Amino acid sequence: MDLKKTLLMPKTSFAMQANLSTSEKNFHDFWKDKKVFQKLKKQNKGKQIKILHDGPPYANGSIHVGHALNKILKDFILRSWLYEGYDVVFIPGWDCHGLPIEHAVSKKNPSSYSNLSTVEKRKLCHQFALSQIAVQKEQFQRLGLLNDFQNCYYTIDESFQFKELELFLQAIKKGLIFQDLKPTYWSPISRTSLAEAEIEYKEVNSIALYLTFKVSKSDFLDENANLLVWTTTPWTLPTNQAIAIHPDFDYLLFEYNQQKFVILEKLFEVFTNKLNWTNAIKLKKFKGSNLKNSSYSHCFYNKVLPVLMGIHVVDNEGTGIVHSSPAFGIDDFYLCQKNKIKEVLISIDEKGVFNNLLNDKELENCFYLKANDLIINRLKQNNSFIFSEVISHREPHDWRSKTPVIYRASKQLFIKTKSIKKQLKKQINQVNFLNSKNQLRLKEMLLQRDEWCISRQRVWGLPIPIVYANNKPLLDFSTIQYTIKQLKKHGIDSWFEKDVTCFLKPDKTKKWVKYHKEIDTLDVWFDSGSSYNVLEINKYGSIADLYIEGSDQYRGWFNSSSNCGIIQNDLIPFKSLVSHGFTLDENGNKMSKSLGNIVDPLKICDQYGADILRLWVANTDWQIDNKIGVNILKQVAEQYRRIRNSLLRFILGNINGFNFTSMDDYKFSLEDKIVIHKTNSLVEQIEKFLEKYNFLGCLKVINKFVLWLSSWYFEIIKDTLYCDAKNNPNRLAKQAVLNYIFTQLISFLNIFIPHTAEDAWKNYSFNKKPISVNLFTKPTVFKVANSKNLENIYKTFTSIKNAAFKEIEKLRKEGLISKNNQIELTVGINKKIPKKLKDNLALWLNVNSVNLTNNENEIKVKKTKKTMCERCWNFQTIIKQKLDHNLCSRCFKVC
């Protein structure tokens, strides 16, 4: 007789090797063919709605690992809401306007692009954006996201754009829009103004220059005194229009080499030590206010200019005397305006090149940074140069082109965010944050800005619906309302095709007035900031339950969305807000092409599988920056194999063909009840973690549970599962417990590794199951009686087990035993233990027998002399012969 054939060994088609890179695509096809997402929406219709609003990624290029982190986190949240029984709303979106798309299109045909009309350029940009969206859609779906990507929003949708224009109209109604000539961030490479949200700071090396301006007139200083000035922008010196001195700081007049100089007293030692002016003589100390109404001569033009009192002057760097060029510095601009210096010398054009404003032939057509050397040489020629050095400091850069930006005065359109600060502050206090520090962070970002520059000098964007009469913007509500009405009638691109009169009320047009349309387009942050309107378009209101994006969005999307929401609806458009960190390489470095350390999420999916990438996300403390790389992914893959094989494959193999009825129909043993209780406790823990989006906490307790199950319960029930009669009540009860564990955990695993969960569900032999695990609703919890007593029993068992296994391990190392079931164990215990535990100790310890004594701490281990059953390999006293095989009484009956 072949004894192996009499055993009930595990059988399942759920493979040990996942082959995720291949199998995952099959499940995508399955979900699509079976319309699983549509069935899920239908199944949840009528339930309480919960909305996660998607911050739109930019429609250009392939997705990167940061995109993957973002979308996978959102998918975790959506799936956890579905588990809790909500009707979940998530509409994927794309940000489609802006410079990168315009650049990408122009690069394709650089010679012909410049000859195209505005509308032709816009059509090419529109087509390009849609092509990029198609690519990214497919890539996002590779991540196993629970969405069919059929109902999406694009910021170039007409419905979206007209909602955005309604927001603009509301800003007009509230008197928040104004035009002004003032310095804003300007990108010479992109040739457009930028908002603060589009700026990032980089550490760079720059020239720091010390120079002098000679006093021309002063009631306090001699005319031959030199004002020491420090600047890191020598190229702005030609447009110097004033010098700023802090009225309350202490300044010093000192003499060196028969020349007199003025500097901030606090910085005197630093300056003289730097130049080794050891013989400098201090002459007198005075307050900056003493130089009020003084004047000086320009460093190389024949001009006499004023010394102004400026409280923006700092005392921790430079000289405490600041050169002011109102065209290229915001503090300079406001200081000069306050002192009635209205002229703004904009000597740099939109490309960053000197124009002919200064009538300085040497500077004309010179790029601003290249002008530094020329200007320093001039200063040397007229003895105004003191010293220059290269310093490392932070300078603003365009966050898209990664190139330096400058402050440059130009006529722009602004929103008076100062007027809505009170509402913003009140509303932010009502938003839920996982971390209170982030609430403070957003509040600071919102309240530090008084205005928002919303105009961009680009073709590819939503046109600003303003008409000018004799170069003055018509900002009255009725005019703008009519203009938008005409755009709705003729289409957005009609703005670039039709005559200006089309957008003016006939009774408002006057023959003697010259009209023209605004040629700038709206800031892309105004686009994405108004994206909450998508919810209203889809009849879900205008407030989402949750916004979640990267931590850089406090100055970006979180900021613009808050401002737009207050302007349009007097409400911030989210109830809760959380942010995630950035992805770094394995060594903690920022990823970049130049370093060659970019981790491609699509390559991870092809090599390891999307479920491994998703499991990596679940294993991160995602609110901070996290590392990813080959070694980290290998660790994640090992964890995955444990879940797949030690948990899912073991269960599926042992419940194959099991006809489960109701949990009440089975008589559970003590160990069964403990496992059911532990499973219920695990479910409670996971649900609490999910409420806080603590996915790492979920994975930790799941892994701990799997290790516990596989090392104890699964080990001690193998004998029953494999060797008992198929319909033995005890065996059926064990199968019911395994089935219970599977049904309780599969929904949680579907949150994190949906392809694997679907694979397991496909191999789950229960004929009343839904077609997909995604349609499986939250299962009922089966409560076991006296759960506290079960905990105490297991706690007592654990203390016995830990002590006994130390001795057992000694015998194993000495080679005296190979299996625990060969052991006869004597354990001394000084306290009463429940009879139920006594009766189960041998089984739970997986040993042959246990003898309890009263001798505290006594532990004896010896090898049994009993005979081994050839079928179950257990050692028994009574052994029966059957067809030349030694069998225990149980195996004798089964065979």
UniProtKB/Swiss-Prot annotation:
- UniProt EC number: 6.1.1.5
* Pfam families, per the entry: Anticodon_1, tRNA-synt_1
Q: Which reaction does it catalyse?
A: tRNA(Ile) + L-isoleucine + ATP = L-isoleucyl-tRNA(Ile) + AMP + diphosphate
Q: How is the cofactor bound?
A: Binds 1 zinc ion per subunit.
Matching InterPro entries, A to Z?
Answer: aa-tRNA-synth_I_CS (IPR001412), aa-tRNA-synth_Ia (IPR002300), Anticodon_Ile_BEm (IPR033708), Ile-tRNA-ligase (IPR002301), Ile-tRNA-ligase_type1 (IPR023585), Ile-tRNA_ligase (IPR050081), M/V/L/I-tRNA-synth_anticd-bd (IPR013155), Rossmann-like_a/b/a_fold (IPR014729)
Annotated residues for binding of Zn(2+): 869, 872, 888, 891
GO MF: aminoacyl-tRNA deacylase activity; ATP binding; isoleucine-tRNA ligase activity; tRNA binding; zinc ion binding
Entry protein name: Isoleucine--tRNA ligase
Q: Which organism is it from?
A: Mycoplasma genitalium (strain ATCC 33530 / DSM 19775 / NCTC 10195 / G37)
**Source organism lineage?**
Bacteria, Bacillati, Mycoplasmatota, Mycoplasmoidales, Mycoplasmoidaceae
